[in-house]
Each structure stands twice: as C-alpha cells, then as structure tokens.
C-alpha cells in the first residue's frame, strides 16, 4: 500500500448524526470477501430509489453534481456506529473516499478505516460546524488534510487533530497488519529455521 501524507480534495457534506454501517453498506451486499466492488453500493438505500440501484435519488447529497468526485466525507457525530462489518470502510474506499471528518467515530469503524488506509479525522463539533458552513456555501470547496502535521486546512484556517502515533505511523507508511508483519520477515525466517524438524 502507498502511504498517506497529505491530501487535498473535494468535500461532500453528509449532515446526519449516528450513521450506522447498515446505512453505509446494507446487509444484502455483504456476500463478497474481497475489498473491490462495494463502492457502487455505498449508501445504497439513500442513493437510489429502487432496489436495483438504477434510479438515483435526486434528493441525496452525494448524487448532487457539485459533489461528484468527492474524496473527503464530512459527517456528524458517531459516524460508523452499528455492526462491526469491515465492508463499510471497503465501500467508502472503493467509492473514492480517502478522508472522513466528524466529531466522533464508532471505535471499531475507526480502527477498520485506518486498516484500510483511510484517515478518520476527529474535530470538535464547532469546527465541524464551520466546515459544513464553508462547504455548503462554496461549490467546489476543497479541504487539505495533512497527516504529517496533523492539520486540516480550509478557508484560510487551520484545525489541529490527534491520532495515536502507532496508527499515524501505519498510515504514513502504508502499513496494514500484513505489512507490519512483513517488516519482520527476516526475524520470522530466522526463528523458523531454529525450529527442530520434528516440530515442523
């Protein structure tokens, strides 16, 4: 995986609190176990008026032409609550979302997002309010998220955020659990070479 240092992107504002993983990716789309192909089902029951996903809902914000190609999702508190399905961050990432900004995230969803190289940024409610006002008032509004400096930059302002050092290291260096393990491949091979043959 490539690392994440800084990203500037178009922002889509999803002004709803307590969005759960069933809304992010409904249960009928969970049959696959790889990460590809879930983006077309993201927020399916909100994005579409029909079960087949052929009739876009013109009232849903992500269907608005001004937000086409958005890579940053702005949301309200407790984003990603509900069941712990990893398909939710898979769907967001496959759709093209690289960063999510909200006052809070469900704990398991937060960890799953980082494992899938997306950056969940926690800001205060007041700061999120300011970003909603900026994005909704300015078509094509972009935000910069600088993970190295742990800053969000928008509308001439800077907002600081925190992320624990280990998770930040993983994101900056594009490391998931497998990547972390492979960093110690030499030591693993050395250990395995010492195992008696009758134990292999």
UniProtKB/Swiss-Prot annotation:
Entry keywords, A to Z = Amino-acid biosynthesis, Branched-chain amino acid biosynthesis, Leucine biosynthesis, Lyase
Q: Which residues form the signal peptide?
A: none
The UniProt entry's GO CC annotations, sorted and at most eight, read: 3-isopropylmalate dehydratase complex
Its top-level enzyme class, in one word, is lyase
Annotated metabolic or biological route of this protein:
Amino-acid biosynthesis; L-leucine biosynthesis; L-leucine from 3-methyl-2-oxobutanoate: step 2/4
User: Tell me, which GO biological process terms does this entry list?
Assistant: L-leucine biosynthetic process
Looking up InterPro entries in the UniProt record yields:
3-IsopropMal_deHydase_ssu, Aconitase/3IPM_dehydase_swvl, AconitaseA/IPMdHydase_ssu_swvl, IPMI_Swivel, LeuD
Indicate whether Amino-acid biosynthesis appears among the record's keywords: yes
Q: Highest taxon of the source?
A: Bacteria
Q: What is its EC number?
A: 4.2.1.33
Q: Give the quaternary structure.
A: Heterodimer of LeuC and LeuD.
Q: What is this protein called?
A: 3-isopropylmalate dehydratase small subunit
């Amino acid at each position: 995986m490539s690392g994440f240092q800084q990203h500037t992107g178009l922002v889509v504002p999803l002004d709803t609190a307590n969005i759960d993983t069933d809304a992010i990716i409904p249960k009928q789309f969970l049959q696959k176990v790889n990460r590809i192909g879930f983006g077309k089902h993201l927020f399916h029951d909100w994005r579409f008026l029909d079960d087949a996903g052929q009739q876009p809902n013109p009232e849903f914000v992500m269907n608005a032409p001004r937000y086409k190609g958005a890579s940053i999702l702005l949301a309200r508190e407790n984003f990603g609550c509900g069941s712990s399905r990893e398909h939710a961050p898979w769907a967001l990432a496959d759709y093209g979302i690289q960063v999510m900004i909200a006052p809070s995230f469900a704990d398991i969803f937060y960890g799953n997002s980082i494992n899938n190289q997306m950056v969940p940024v926690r800001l205060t409610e007041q700061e999120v309010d300011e970003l909603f006002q900026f994005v909704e008032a300015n078509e094509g509004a972009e935000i910069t998220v600088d993970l190295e400096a742990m800053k969000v930059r928008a509308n001439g302002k800077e907002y600081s955020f925190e992320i624990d050092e280990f998770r930040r290291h993983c994101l900056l260096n594009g490391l998931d659990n497998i990547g972390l393990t492979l960093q110690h491949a030499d030591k693993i091979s050395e250990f395995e070479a010492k195992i008696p043959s009758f134990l292999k």
